[in-house]
């Protein structure tokens, strides 16, 4: 039996960022191995991806995954999603990768008699939604959340059976592993060998709570103890210019703060390996795949309190959590992190692809075996 899945996503193949990578990992896990259950040998997932961003042309996609060209217009996107579902009917599952598209996903699931799976990541789902989105969330047959915090925040306002809300965290790829950074790469970045603090993430004006500015304010005190320390920021976005201006206002030159811009995926392992501490004391991270990538490379990590990064940091097993609004605590945490050395990457083994794939396939099997939720408005 083929399980046909229409996936409505913001981005997937051909797009950067943690959510795009999550979608890729999830879909590949669902199509590359048998599902669980007594009839597993008879089942095969086939996924039709409809993205709003990200062009997969020229990318060799895994077998049983097809991705359509990106469509940003809301109306046109809805028409394309309906056409894809109609053309490939019967459809068994409508997967929704963002609450923004939940009403459309719910409508398609009702029309085609399919099960409806909603994936949630972070702040997009932490607060109550307006009437239509709320109804679409509450009608999901299955909701998966990347962290315990996201699950708890969602259940705090949505009328959902807790048994229908499962935690399915990010996974980390095998390319992220301990090693020695290429000397040529370090030379290319102009790093002379002093301690390196590293943050990796999109610099978006809608995501200003990743902790860059609190770190800026304590860099002079840190450099008093570690004179050659450099804070390296990898990532690009519409907030980069403001952050660069803020660093200049504080008198932090290139010798102290280095903005790298976008870093290709293939360079990330070397970037993590040359750093001494990964720092992203965020207040609104849904999970944070970058924490896992850093820890997988042996790098100790520093996250914020109260958000989903706690799951990645595993209650201090691979680092620590700190309040970014407390400069003294932040300073002490970074000092401790720099003095404590590297971590054992075995601590994040549960987040490797084999375990993630088993849980993902089990979740899909449970969804297919569970009765459909009532589709009444």
Descriptions of predicted regions:
Residues 8, 191-210, 216-219:
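Conserved donor-binding/catalytic core segment of Leloir-type glycosyltransferases
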Residues 96-102:
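Short His-centered aromatic/hydrophobic patch
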Residues 137, 262-263, 270-275:
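Short alpha-helical donor nucleotide-sugar binding micro-motif in glycosyltransferases
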Residues 241-263:
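Nucleotide-activated donor-binding/catalytic signature segment of Leloir-type glycosyltransferases, i.e.
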Residues 283:
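Aromatic "clamp/platform" in nucleotide-sugar-dependent glycosyltransferases that forms part
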Residues 300-303:
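Short hydrophobic beta-strand element within catalytic cores of glycosyltransferases
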Residues 315-316, 320-327, 335-341:
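Conserved acidic donor-binding segment of nucleotide-sugar-dependent glycosyltransferases
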Residues 339-375:
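A charged, aromatic-enriched C-terminal amphipathic alpha-helix characteristic of glycosyltransferases
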């Amino acid at each position: 039996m083929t399980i046909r899945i229409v996936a409505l996503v913001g981005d997937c193949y051909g797009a950067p960022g943690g959510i795009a990578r999550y979608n890729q990992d999830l879909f590949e896990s669902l199509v590359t191995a048998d599902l669980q259950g007594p009839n597993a040998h008879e089942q095969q997932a086939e996924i039709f991806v409809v993205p709003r961003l990200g062009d997969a042309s020229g990318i060799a996609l895994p077998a049983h995954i097809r991705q359509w060209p990106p469509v940003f217009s809301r109306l046109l996107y809805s028409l394309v999603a309906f056409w894809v579902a109609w053309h490939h009917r019967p459809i068994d599952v409508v997967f929704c990768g963002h609450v923004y598209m939940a009403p459309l996903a719910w409508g398609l699931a009702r029309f085609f008699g399919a099960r409806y799976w909603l994936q949630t990541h972070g702040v997009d789902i932490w607060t109550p939604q307006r009437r239509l989105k709320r109804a679409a969330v509450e009608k999901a047959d299955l909701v998966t959340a990347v962290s315990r915090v996201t699950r708890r925040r969602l259940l705090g306002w949505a009328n959902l059976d807790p048994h229908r809300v499962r935690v399915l965290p990010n996974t980390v790829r095998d390319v992220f592993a301990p090693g020695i950074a290429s000397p040529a790469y370090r030379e290319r970045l102009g790093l002379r060998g002093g301690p390196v603090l590293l943050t990796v993430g999109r610099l978006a004006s809608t995501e200003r709570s990743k902790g860059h500015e609190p770190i800026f304010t304590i860099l002079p005190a840190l450099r008093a103890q570690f004179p050659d320390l450099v804070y390296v920021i990898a990532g690009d976005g519409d907030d980069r210019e403001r952050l660069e201006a803020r660093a200049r206002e504080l008198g932090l030159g290139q010798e102290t703060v280095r903005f790298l811009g976008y870093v290709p995926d293939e360079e990330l392992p070397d970037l993590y390996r040359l750093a001494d501490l990964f720092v992203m004391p965020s207040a609104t991270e849904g999970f944070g795949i970058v924490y896992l990538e850093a820890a997988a490379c042996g790098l100790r990590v520093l996250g914020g309190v109260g958000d989903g990064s706690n799951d990645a940091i595993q209650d201090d097993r691979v680092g620590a959590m700190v309040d970014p609004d407390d400069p003294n605590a932040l300073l002490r945490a970074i000092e401790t992190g720099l003095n404590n050395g590297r971590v054992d990457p075995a601590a994040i083994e549960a987040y490797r692809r084999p375990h993630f794939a088993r849980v993902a396939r089990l979740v899909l099997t449970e969804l297919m075996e569970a009765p459909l939720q009532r589709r009444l408005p």
